[in-house]
């Protein structure tokens, strides 16, 4: 799950290897480069295992791996090469960049929020919001969160869920790393984050989490409102992904929840 609108951190472009398809997408930033149509994706690499940066500054995770597959699928489906470029930025700036035609897509752990005026793809992952706790915390249930100090990511669906907790003092922070740093310093009683992110941090033994979820969700790709052409192409890619062996492999690799497919 993730966020909604403010400042660009950096504009590092990563071209994921591989060719993919079709004529130029409906967005103003999709273009032909070396006979390949380029789709630019805004991504916030602070949300492992969805997306993060390694020591070389490369963006890694489920979503970048998915984008690499989308390049292949688009080439096969459209019959002309495509490239997907990842443009690094703050999560809460992605929607603004879409609206300004600076990027074509946002792929960064987005879960549905009615107030986000964007085009939504079909879902590609299951998700939920859970409470992460410092190791040794006396909190064992969602009821125990009442009246507690809770950190969330600004603009996220986790923020919305936390504000529903009776008497909770909810503070929005910039990104998941800031949240968990503050939590480990005992500045907050709990944090509400995506389950995939929570499991990533709980695995190192520093944190625990409440077994119950605050809300169950799904992850989506987003585009500028009205840009149905690029979303239609991505929906075909998602359909191909969900039916492939690679899908379960990626979910297992990153410890994420696959969608139930018929």
Over which residues does each language-model region extend?
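C-terminal motif of bacterial Sec signal peptides marking the signal peptidase cleavage site
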Residues: 15-18
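Extended ligand-binding regions for polar small-molecule ligands
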Residues: 20, 64-73, 149, 156, ...
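Ligand-binding clefts/hinges and TM-proximal coupling segments of bilobed small-molecule sensing domains
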Residues: 21, 25-27, 35-36, 80-82, ...
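Extracytoplasmic small-molecule ligand-binding "clamshell" domains
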Residues: 29-108
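Periplasmic-binding protein-like
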Residues: 44-45, 125-133, 195-239, 257-262
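Bilobed "Venus flytrap"/periplasmic-binding protein-like clamshell domains
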Residues: 59-74, 127-180, 195-199
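Short helix-initiation/N-cap motifs at beta->coil->alpha
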Residues: 82-96, 157, 171-185, 217
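Acidic, polar ligand-binding/catalytic clefts
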Residues: 84-144, 206-213
